[in-house]
C-alpha cells in the first residue's frame, strides 16, 4: 500500500472531513479545486503515478489540505469519477431523453458532453483515461465497466425505441450497432480530450449528426 492509499489516521471515523481546517482550506470551492486538479493529473499520469503531493503542488495547496477532504488516493479517485459521471454521462442522457428520435438523442448526448468540454476539457480526458486505468488496476474496474454499461444501455435503448417507432429497420442487430456507436462515442471523447480543439469537436458532432439523419452524403 502506498502512502497515498493509506487512510488518514486523524480523520473522524465514518466521515470524510476532519475537525478544523488546515492551511489553504476554503470550504467547497477548495474541494472543487482539488477535484479539478486531480482530474487533470489522473488523466495525465494515470492512477498509479499520480500522488497527493503532485495534486497539492499543482493546486497550490498542502498535502494536509488534500487529506482534509479525502482519506486516500482511491477515495479521491472515486470522487473524481463520480463528478465526471454526473457532469458528462448523466447530464448527456438527461438531454437525450427530450429528443424526439434516434439521431436527435445521440446528438443531444454528444452536444451536452461538448458543452462540458467547452468549460473544462479535463472531464473528457478523465473519462477516456479512466477506461485505460481500469484495465491496469482491478480495483478501478467495476466503476469504469458500470459506466460503460450505462452508456451501452442508453444507446441500445435508443435503438430499440427507434425500431418500435419505425425509424430503423426491424431486423437491426441492436447489440452490434450499440457497440459500434459506443466505440464512436468513446473515440469522440478521446478526440475531445486529447486531439482536437473545441471548435473542431463541434464540427465533428455536426457531421456525425448529419451522418445519423442521412443528410451527410
Where are each of the predicted segments found?
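Hydrophobic alpha-helical connector segments
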Residues: 79, 90-123, 174-181, 202-205
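Short coil/turn segments at alpha/beta junctions that flank glycine-rich nucleotide-binding fingerprints
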Residues: 44-48, 99, 120, 165
Amino acid at each position: 500500500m502506498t502512502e497515498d492509499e493509506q487512510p488518514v489516521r486523524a480523520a473522524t471515523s465514518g466521515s470524510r472531513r476532519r475537525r478544523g481546517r488546515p492551511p489553504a482550506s476554503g470550504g467547497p470551492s477548495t474541494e472543487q479545486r482539488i477535484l479539478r486538479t486531480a482530474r487533470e493529473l489522473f488523466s495525465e499520469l494515470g492512477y498509479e503515478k499520480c500522488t497527493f503531493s503532485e495534486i497539492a503542488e499543482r493546486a497550490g495547496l498542502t498535502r494536509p489540505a488534500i487529506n482534509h477532504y479525502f482519506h486516500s488516493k482511491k477515495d479521491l479517485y472515486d470522487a473524481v469519477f463520480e463528478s465526471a459521471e454526473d457532469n458528462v454521462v448523466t447530464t448527456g442522457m438527461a438531454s437525450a431523453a427530450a429528443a424526439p428520435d434516434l439521431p436527435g438523442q445521440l446528438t443531444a448526448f454528444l452536444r451536452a458532453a461538448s458543452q462540458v468540454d467547452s468549460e473544462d476539457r479535463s472531464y473528457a480526458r478523465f473519462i477516456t483515461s479512466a477506461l485505460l486505468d481500469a484495465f491496469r488496476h482491478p480495483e478501478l474496474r467495476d466503476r469504469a465497466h458500470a459506466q460503460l454499461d450505462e452508456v451501452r444501455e442508453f444507446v441500445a435503448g435508443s435503438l430499440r425505441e427507434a425500431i418500435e417507432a419505425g425509424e430503423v429497420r426491424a431486423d437491426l442487430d441492436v447489440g452490434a450497432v450499440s457497440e459500434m456507436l459506443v466505440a464512436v462515442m468513446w473515440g469522440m471523447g478521446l478526440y475531445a480530450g486529447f486531439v482536437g480543439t473545441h471548435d473542431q469537436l463541434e464540427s465533428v458532432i455536426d457531421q456525425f449528426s448529419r451522418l445519423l439523419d442521412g443528410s451527410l452524403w
